[in-house]
């Protein structure tokens, strides 16, 4: 079952993130407070996948009024290759469409072979015509990668 994510899901979603090799978790943005702030700003667009009462997948999804963005798209390794990821993406995009968002993007690490193959398989286009820039406003927001 795919449903909207709520802050009550945080502990289970965070535990899922911690299980995934190579997953980058930010100390502030991905804290309970950070995710709660994100969900308050985007109350309808983030989703979880639930199997037998257990959260096995999640997407943080939001928008700025113009473009949507997917973050932390993941499915527990034991549940992959069953359409869960695709179904979560479809649900998140339906919610974006309902809010009149016409385009959605995401960032995937270049070394994330599984993720990059997934996005190609479900019809997403890899952009080759732009550069991605960022500027850190809070140095305390450290990213740690799971091993």
Language-model segments: residues:
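Residue-level recognition of the GNAT/N-acetyltransferase active site
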Residues: 6, 76, 80, 109
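Charged catalytic carboxylate motif
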Residues: 9-12, 87-88, 114
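Conserved acetyl-CoA-binding loop of GNAT-fold acetyltransferases
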Residues: 120-129
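Conserved GNAT acetyl-CoA-binding A-motif
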Residues: 96-108
């Amino acid at each position: 079952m795919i449903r909207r994510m709520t802050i009550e899901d945080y502990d289970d979603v965070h535990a899922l993130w911690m299980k995934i090799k190579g997953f980058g978790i930010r100390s502030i943005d991905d804290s309970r407070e950070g995710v709660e702030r994100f969900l308050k700003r985007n109350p309808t667009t983030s989703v979880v996948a639930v199997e037998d009462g257990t959260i096995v997948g999640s997407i943080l999804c939001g928008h700025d009024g113009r473009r949507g963005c997917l973050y932390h798209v993941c499915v527990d390794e034991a549940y992959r290759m069953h359409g869960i990821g695709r179904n979560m993406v479809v649900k998140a995009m339906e919610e974006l469409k309902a809010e009149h968002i016409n385009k959605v993007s995401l960032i995937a690490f270049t070394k994330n072979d599984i993720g990059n193959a997934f996005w190609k398989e479900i019809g997403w286009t890899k952009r080759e015509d732009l550069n991605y820039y960022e500027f850190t406003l809070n140095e305390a927001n450290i990213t740690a990668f799971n091993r």
